[in-house]
A protein has these predicted regions:
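N-terminal, polar/charged subdomain of small-to-medium soluble alpha/beta proteins
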Residues: 1-103
């Protein structure tokens, strides 16, 4: 299992958020038989009141010869993390099929 580095910008990372990120992003990384080199998760809260989706989760996964980067925003941090996990899963599926087709 790859170590997931979690950092927060303008937000403190609680134990519940840390557990949720480990569970959701970790499960998305385990689904496909891909061993990423590293994974970085940045959770950010924007202070702009006119932006309804102020909470953002950015996930960067470094795999061999490729980088998968997704961003998801929502008004709830947990929803943003869930959306980012779905996007990572979709991108890794595309990467996996591309690698298999080129063999």
């Amino acid at each position: 299992m790859v170590d997931i580095k979690i950092s927060g910008r303008k937000v403190s990372i609680s134990e519940a958020l840390h557990t949720h990120v480990d569970q959701k992003i970790g499960d998305a990384l385990k689904v496909f038989d891909i061993t990423p080199m590293s994974c970085d998760v940045v959770l950010r809260v924007d202070k702009n009141p006119s932006n309804p989706d102020r909470k953002t989760a950015e996930v960067t996964v470094f795999v061999r010869n490729n980088v998968v980067r997704v961003t998801a925003s929502s008004d709830d941090m947990y929803v943003a993390i869930d959306e980012a996990a779905e996007k990572v899963s979709r991108q890794l599926r595309k990467y996996k099929t591309k690698v298999v087709e080129r063999r």
